[in-house]
Amino acid sequence: ASILHLNISKIKSKYILVFLIIAVYFVTIKFHYRYNVDRKFLDIESVNKKNAINAEILSPKMKHLKWVTPYTDPNEEIEVIKKAIQIIGLDKRKKVLITHYQFLSVILNEDLNLLNRWYLWGNDTHPTETHKYFNFYKKMVNENIKRNEIEVIYILSQENEILFKHVKNYFTAKCFNSKNIFDNKFSYHEIISCKK
């Protein structure tokens, strides 16, 4: 559509112009239904959306939204997230949250010092140890931890999806007191002084 708009004055035939405008209109409608209405671009493309539940049970801020997941029972996932919200909300220390659930900072009305939008190993969402920018990323993570005086790192994901053993290598000269809170889905890792 933008290319057509830029070149519209160069098109001499009214028939070609009308054809192109109609074609752009129908293509726009087709893609709207496919990608916006049917959500073909998301991981929930093949999920039965009839299993969706009201997301408002997580927070009033999610009123009018539905929750559906490709991983597990939506109710089970909501329970884990609710428990995480409760624990993270009560913890007044400065923290980092490593998760795909980016909306938690909005629900908690708190800066959770999110490092990435998402974490998918082997999918180039962030540099892993074999990536040429790993040391640059690691330095950035450690500078953020120091600058923001982070005391604890929380991890919230699907079961065994984001494991601390995969994340730990980003933290230089740090020791942790770790606890798995909920079935390898939710854990915390308190930064402690290393014993010499």
Which residues make up each language-model segment?
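Short amphipathic alpha-helical segments and helix-helix/interface helices
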Residues: 85-88, 141-142, 168
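Residues at the C-termini of beta-strands that transition into short coil/loop
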Residues: 20-23, 116-119, 182
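Signature aromatic-anchored transmembrane alpha helix within multi-pass, membrane-resident enzymes
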Residues: 1-42
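Aromatic/acidic, Gly/Pro-rich catalytic loop(s) in extracytoplasmic/lumenal soluble domains
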Residues: 148-196
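Short, flexible/disordered intra-domain loops and linkers
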Residues: 72, 124-133, 160-166
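Short periplasmic/luminal acceptor-recognition loop of GT-C membrane glycosyltransferases, typified by
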Residues: 33-38, 49-122, 151-160
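Extended hydrophobic/aromatic segments used for targeting, binding, or gating
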Residues: 108, 112-150
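Well-ordered, non-membrane alpha-helical segments in soluble/globular domains
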Residues: 77-84, 133-140, 163-164
